[in-house]
Amino acid sequence: TVYGNPDILPVTEETPFKAAQSPYGETKQKCEALLNCSSIDSVSLRYFNPIGSHESSLIGDRSTDKPSNLIPIICKSVTNNTQMLVHGDDYETKDGTCVRDYIHVVDLAKSHVAALNYLILKQGKHVYNVGTGNGVSVLEIIKLFEDANDIKLDYEVGPRREGDVVEVYADCSKINKELKWSAEKTLENCMVDSWGWENNMDR
């Protein structure tokens, strides 16, 4: 995440950046710094955690054999009949596991359309959080996936993973107000669509 490990939640667009927890997070911070130094009109969309796929199961993320994101990890665990590793359960969160703001990729795509249309009408530099505003833990995601797809996951808890932000979720009031955009898909939609895409890839 561009915010690092924030002190106050939810994060707004005015929340100061903390130290990036990974090279990926650092690139996000540097890209925004470059845009701020340029004369280019721009919209920076600060994604939170995109998940899901198109409900048709025809468009999705073809992850590597060793995915690093939670939902692809879950799906690969099921398809390969292997045990999944939860990276730490001793964080200061509601159940000890990391907390994220998960957003369906279809909602995310719609936010891009809204942002481009807004930039046509209102030039300048704009920044928006793109999330749902809800913090969900790793263990909660596992339970949601199991319930939505009637699947029992095999997992164990291991040590923390370097570079993981403990907890972050968005205040989306700015994008709701200015772009008239808000997430519509539920987490259950995300779980069903993710598993549908994974099954379709194996055919």
Q: Predicted regions span which residues?
A:
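Catalytic helix-loop patch of NAD(P)-dependent Rossmann-fold dehydrogenases
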Residues: 2-49, 58-69
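Feature marks short, surface-exposed loop/turn motifs that line or immediately flank catalytic pockets
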Residues: 3, 51-54, 134-136
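Short aromatic-enriched loop/helix-cap "lid" or pocket-rim segments at secondary-structure transitions
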Residues: 7-9, 54-59, 98-99, 141-142
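A short alpha-helix capping/helix-coil boundary motif
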Residues: 12-15, 51-55, 122, 150-153
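Short alpha-helix within the catalytic core of nucleotide-sugar-dependent glycosyltransferases
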Residues: 36, 71, 109, 113
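Short amphipathic alpha-helices and their capping/turn segments at secondary-structure boundaries
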Residues: 38-39, 72-80
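C-terminal catalytic core of Y-nucleophile DNA break-rejoin enzymes
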Residues: 68-71, 104
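C-terminal substrate-binding subdomain of Rossmann-fold SDR/epimerase-dehydratase oxidoreductases
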Residues: 76-203
